[in-house]
Curated annotation (Swiss-Prot):
Role summary: Forms part of the ribosomal stalk which helps the ribosome interact with GTP-bound translation factors. Is thus essential for accurate translation.
InterPro entries: Ribosomal_bL12 (IPR000206), Ribosomal_bL12_C (IPR013823), Ribosomal_bL12_C/ClpS-like (IPR014719), Ribosomal_bL12_oligo (IPR008932), Ribosomal_bL12_oligo_N_sf (IPR036235)
Species for this entry: Citrifermentans bemidjiense (strain ATCC BAA-1014 / DSM 16622 / JCM 12645 / Bem)
Keywords on record: Ribonucleoprotein, Ribosomal protein
Pfam families referenced in this protein's UniProt entry, alphabetically: Ribosomal_L12, Ribosomal_L12_N
Protein's recorded name: Large ribosomal subunit protein bL12
NCBIfam families registered for this protein in UniProt: L12
Length: 126
């Protein structure tokens, strides 16, 4: 007697998360496939980016590339632009290149870039 699809689904529904994870791993090894398809779908999303570049971009990211010579002034500006504490702002500046602000308007990005450059930082707006 063959097992029906419904019986297989019912059996899988009653498995614990650990048992299900082991089953997936065994199936991947047996059939030489990967269950990471959602990652591949998400990676395909940015491919549409160049087509959208014809339209005007509405969200920008301010990236701190380097702190420059006056790191203390840059840390102060980063704290002013964000809601970060002193340690977090210092870690961000020390870890450059890092995003300072993401998903902001063109005007806000230009203002943030101006403040950071005046403090001596090297900044990129994407």
């Amino acid at each position: 007697m063959a097992i029906t699809k419904e019986e297989v689904i019912s059996f899988i529904e009653n498995m614990s998360v650990l048992e299900l994870a082991n089953l997936v791993k065994e199936l991947e090894e047996k059939f030489g496939v990967s269950a990471a398809a959602p990652v591949a779908v998400a990676a395909a999303g940015p491919a549409a980016g160049p087509a959208e570049s014809a339209e005007e971009k509405t969200e920008f990211d301010v990236i701190l590339k380097a702190a420059g010579a006056n790191k203390i002034a840059v840390i102060k500006v980063v704290r002013g632009l964000t809601s970060l504490g002193l340690k977090e702002a210092k870690d961000l500046v020390d870890g450059a290149p890092q995003p300072v602000k993401t998903g902001i308007s063109k005007e806000e990005a230009a203002d943030a870039q101006k403040q950071l450059v005046e403090a001596g930082a090297e900044v990129e707006v994407k």
